[in-house]
């Protein structure tokens, strides 16, 4: 990726709401991150030149109030990256996404592959 640029964002905030079992709080936190952080970020980068990857280190479903082995949502976005049709950024939709199920150590390599294919 010598000529590629990418930004990786690790989401931690929603995890706390998962531990509290607060699904509404978790959803609102993700919406706030989307509006305040990503809204600002996307206004200030050239998405034709920069890809953005969003993920976390584990799933924390509200129903469990703890960490689980559910898939962790991963979003990779940029003008040159094709949408896989996923409509929501959730553990459930992560199971159905085009990226598939990966081990944690495979995520960055898969992201680089997807970004390069977008060229």
Q: What are these language model-derived features?
A:
Residues 1-119:
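Feature captures the catalytic ectodomains and active-site-proximal regions of enzymes
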């Amino acid at each position: 990726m010598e000529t590629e640029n990418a930004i990786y964002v690790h989401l931690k905030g929603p995890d706390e709401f998962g531990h509290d079992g607060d699904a509404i709080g978790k959803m609102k936190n993700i919406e706030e991150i989307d509006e305040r952080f990503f809204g600002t970020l996307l206004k200030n980068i050239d998405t034709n030149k920069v890809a953005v990857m969003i993920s976390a280190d584990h799933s924390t479903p509200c129903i469990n109030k703890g960490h689980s082995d559910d898939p962790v949502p991963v979003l990779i976005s940029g003008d040159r990256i094709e949408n896989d049709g996923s409509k929501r950024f959730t553990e459930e939709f992560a199971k159905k996404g085009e990226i598939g199920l990966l081990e944690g150590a495979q995520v960055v390599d898969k992201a680089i592959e997807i970004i390069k294919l977008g060229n």
